[in-house]
Amino acid sequence: LYRFADDRHHRYSVPDLDEPERLVASHDGATLNLFVVDDGDHGVRRLTLPWAQDEVIADVMPLVEPSAQTDTVALFGDAADDPAIWLNRKTPSASRILGTDKKAGLHVYDLNGTETQFLAVGRLNNVDVRYDLEVAGQRYDIAVATNRDHNSLHVFLIDPDTGELEDAGQIATGLEEIYGLCLYQDDEGLYAFPNGKSGAIEQWLLRAEGDALQGALVRKLQVDSQPEGCVADDNSGRLFVGEEDSAVWVFPAAADQPAQAEQVVAISERLHADIEGLALYHQGDQHFLVISSQGNNSYVLVDAEPPYRWRGRFRIGMNVAQGIDGVSETDGLEVTSANLGAPYTAGLLVVQDGRNRLPQAPQNFKLVPWTVIDHALQLSENGDSHE
């Protein structure tokens, strides 16, 4: 390994290597961490080097480790996109992760990351989940995804006992290039908020009629440029929308409210474009909005209530012991505060990994226990914000 500095090349070596096979590097602004897989004894060697750069302010933030990862999608390239978490309310440890595949359909995984089901229904972009809807005289949970092949809402019924998904058809929208989506539920019913690349956002009321789900357009909203990530808070009635190159906005989610937006947080030195996935974490008096800051491979937390105070940011590094690489260029993410069993007793964050390494493979999703995020940002210790 060579580094050019001070007008000359400096040579570094990793000792005790027989057959170096793969090299993974991570840089935290001050040090370079190298992990080399030795194909001879199948061990992993770590070398830490001083790697600070003069005249550059280091963008250093806490690192957390993933505890697990899902099976990969089938094809290389930009395929995996947005996860959702379905909570098995009878047996939380049997909950499922739904992951969209922009080239093929919808993947379903257990909490170990093993794929349990795949629905080859076309190019799905974003997905969200809600619970306890009556369809054809039976109670189902429901998942809705945006289908880019038909600019539609693709509906799936979820067996509340097993987590098995069933394709329940599509609802056409008025969007020309459908993109992101989130669901919202209040006393008036279940709503879907699909958005398009033009900045248009539609609000659809979803109702069961016979053995199918039908939709009615009830409201239109707008941001100036391309959005994608969004999340609705059923309790507070707030709809958060990420405008990728600009800011996170909040709208009233109720269909009878004005379509007027308020800025939550804007692109800055701490939040980098693209703004991608958004998710909400609620536990006791903690109410956080989690944001994918894709441009600098990090995640931002702000309060999910006015004045939307800054809480901190972090990155997801590699778990060497488990052979799981770190995460970069995250599109979608999802979080739950439900106790899913160890190690997810305080909840779970699931993120899409844009570059799946160690070894090089198609994209997948990484799982992070909320406890490590809570510890890294000192969220439970006091009310201060942290870098």
Regions found by a protein language model. Give the residues of each.
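Sequence/structural signature of beta-propeller domains
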Residues: L1-E387
